[in-house]
Amino acid sequence: MKNMMPANVILVLAWTLSGVCRDLLSTPAFVQHAVTAGGIPAGFLPAIVFVIAAFLSFSTGTAWGTFGILIPIVVPVAQALDPTLITVTLAATLAGSVFGDHTSPISDTTILSSAGSGCSHIEHVSTQLPYAMLVAVSCFVGYVVSGIVGGSFLPSFGAAVATLIVLLVILHVRSVRSGDTGGEKEEENSAAA
């Protein structure tokens, strides 16, 4: 139970903040008006929400707090703009939040992972970033396609997988051309041991 206390406190504070934003500040109505008045097409909402969630979570170091802040805002906005995009926009919120938390140097999970594995904190962040960025770019493309096709799963999944494959092929070709196969690091590590 002691291990769950920080998560419970974050959730209670996030729910409190979301209640204040929803009831006292009318944040969903304000954001909805800003989105519609700004002329942002509804199809780009999931991709935009993904980027906002990633930035907010990266900046704060908490995915749970980002869930609590953004979900009460983006669900009513998605419902007002295009009800078929509610699920996709919610998924974009969750994915962006987890990506931001995973890559944030101030995230508690990142700090604990580096401490638990016995490696330098900044080194841990820098080694996680390329892998997370590959998936984030693929997700972003998938959310753009999903928004354009109205939340359909297969086209967005296909676009995300195709993007990931293209990025992996590009990285492979670059590593082959530069002669970096990763073998040198393995040789250095075995020589140091």
Each language-model region and where it sits:
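Membrane-interface helix termini and inter-helical loops of multi-pass transporters
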Residues: 22-37
